[in-house]
Amino acid sequence: MRIERVSTDQFKIFLTFDDLIERGFTREDLWHDASNVRSLFSDMMYEASSELGIELEGMLLVQVHLMQAQGMHIFVTQQYEDNSEDEDYIEMKVTLDESKELIFSFMDFEDIISVTSYLDPMGLENIRLYYMEDRYYMILDHIELSRVDKEDIIGVMSEYANPSIVTSHRIEEYGKLIMEENTVQQIKRFFY
């Protein structure tokens, strides 16, 4: 679990699926076991409070973004209100959002060339390739993922790349688009 302060009233937590397993959760538990999820969030808020040296009080707005292969991004914003009735009460509003895409980052273009030989038989066509901050990013959208087994893709990609915690919105805004469509075929044509 990684905790990072964003501003004086906001911080973010990145929790991998391995972190969830260590805490006794599966991905499905997040959708079906509300009481244990509340307990998990309470524990995470306590850890964040201790690590960042902040006192959590009042209302907390919690946004949870589930990333297909990566884990969860949790954004917590503390709203300060004049709530003199019960200062020890913490209210959390939770928003769950599951990402419908897979994003992988590569350190070296050679790894992208290598992985395309495994992606080609899967028939993947709509993979976007970006370059940003000395890394390459492959984004597979939800339409592409509905045609093949996600676990197969994750297995192949994890041999050559790392799951990205950078969102597609940030990559699209700040990254340089290298290939927008037929990425696998283009790489095969130019490098094989």
Swiss-Prot record:
It comes from the Bacteria. GO terms for molecular function: protein-macromolecule adaptor activity. Keywords: Competence. The keyword Isomerase does not apply. It holds the Pfam family MecA. One of its GO terms (biological process) is negative regulation of sporulation resulting in formation of a cellular spore. Signal peptide: none annotated. The N-terminal domain has binding sites for ComK and probably for unfolded/aggregated proteins; the C-terminal domain interacts with ClpC. HAMAP family: MecA. Enables the recognition and targeting of unfolded and aggregated proteins to the ClpC protease or to other proteins involved in proteolysis. Acts negatively in the development of competence by binding ComK and recruiting it to the ClpCP protease. When overexpressed, inhibits sporulation. Also involved in Spx degradation by ClpC. Belongs to the MecA family. Homodimer. This is Adapter protein MecA. The lineage of its organism: Bacteria, Bacillati, Bacillota, Bacilli, Bacillales. The gene is mecA.
